[in-house]
């Protein structure tokens, strides 16, 4: 027993030393002039990735790991920077982090990042198109400025974006929370099979949010129209400006809370199989088993609100 404990302790100590050594000095350094690179393609198996800004004219890559032979491969071909994991090696005990420093305000044509079991952190990035996916790992981004399309997905891990500006946004996680600070876009589609969706500020023409199991909370909404749905979870939407086109909210099992600006002109069509509608604007409280339609002020775009089992609240 003592021998087993000693062996386990020795293994943990060895891994700890390896961790410390992996973080101290890079095992590989590469640099490229910024005009050499128009695209970035990164594909990692287990290495973590950090992308940071630098105030120079070079793109710098540093690799920190506890086994030089297993370090990812770095190369530049046809104006594309490639960083990729080596294949067919044992990942147990292997610790690695790739740091990429990009010149401030450099815009790329396309950035594609894939991680199997990798945490990915991005401070600032400018690109025409952007694709980011992890199978098992967290995604954290501070500022993304994407001219066209942005796709951000994770199979099992959280997605946390402070600010993103893009034309079309698609974000999805199978199991994990999705959080956005500020979104500025034309259209956004955000889905989670099992996890909450939180957005602090949304500006765009249209958004669609859906979660199978988890709450949806969106604040400071400025949009023309939207679709929101949840199978099992509460939906709370807080509008900065009222909608201008038909929109829909639907949940199978969960409350719906809607907050609109005072004196807004719009219509609602509300129904609930088992629940109460609290209309705090007109002071009504009812159980709308069939569709209940109400016009506010001059009337306007219709917001359809449906729940199978849950209360509905509307207030300004």
Model regions and ranges:
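Intrinsically disordered, low-complexity terminal regions
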Residues: 1-316
